[in-house]
UniProtKB/Swiss-Prot annotation:
It comes from Chloroherpeton thalassium (strain ATCC 35110 / GB-78). Required for maturation of 30S ribosomal subunits. This is Ribosome maturation factor RimP. It comes from the Bacteria. InterPro entries: Ribosome_maturation_RimP, RimP_C, RimP_N, RimP_N_sf. One of its GO terms (cellular component) is cytosol. Belongs to the RimP family. Pfam families: DUF150_C, RimP_N. The gene is rimP. GO terms for biological process: ribosomal small subunit assembly; translation. The keyword Cell membrane does not apply. Its main location: cytoplasm. It is found in: Cytoplasm. Keywords: Cytoplasm, Ribosome biogenesis.
């Protein structure tokens, strides 16, 4: 697919989702935001994958609602019909844990979780570290802070280690992925 076509579809979806809200089981409304869109084409069909979220997470029911709404709007839009002249398949889902974080909103909702961050340090070296994401700085130079203190099984009467904190500016982050904890 041409990049300009993808950009037009993405802009259209951003505008469509800009004012969208979904409800949680308690009836509270949550603003939807678009995390990413991927469009794949094969010989007979275009596949549009929409990765959406809310600040409090997104449910399967929310994704089903969004899918129906987006599909109806795509079908009704002459602009989208021109960009998608053949059959398309729409897939709406959460970004999931395997996708890197790309937006401040995603970072905010993951404070306190384990993360793996790949970044370029001041010397130009690419480093990957694991740590507990403890803070997000959005003022001045945006950055995240991780506690990279190794979690070790406690020995009786052992002194806990002081936290070892690493602050990484957003401009140096290449990939940040939330880790699954059991």
């Amino acid at each position: 697919m041409m990049d300009s076509r993808l950009k037009l579809i993405q802009d259209w979806l951003l505008q469509l989702l800009a004012e969208m809200t979904v409800s949680d089981p308690d009836g509270n409304e949550h603003e939807v935001f678009l995390v990413d869109i991927e469009v794949h084409s094969n010989k007979t069909i275009d596949i549009i994958e929409v990765f959406a979220d809310t600040d409090s997470g997104i449910s399967v029911e929310n994704c089903k609602f969004l899918s129906k709404h987006i599909s109806a709007e795509l079908d009704a839009s002459e602009e989208m019909q021109a960009l998608l002249p053949r059959h398309f398949k729409l897939v709406v889902s959460s970004p999931g844990l395997s996708r890197p974080l790309t937006m401040n909103r995603q970072y905010k909702k993951n404070i306190g979780r384990l993360m793996q961050v790949t970044y370029q340090n001041a010397d130009g070296e690419i480093k990957t570290i694991d740590g507990r994401f403890i803070s997000l700085e959005e003022e001045a130079e945006a950055s995240i802070t991780l506690d990279i203190t190794k979690i070790q099984k406690s020995k009786p009467n052992a002194k806990p280690k002081p936290p070892e904190l690493v602050t990484i500016p957003f401009s140096q982050i290449q990939k940040a992925i939330v880790q699954v904890e059991f």
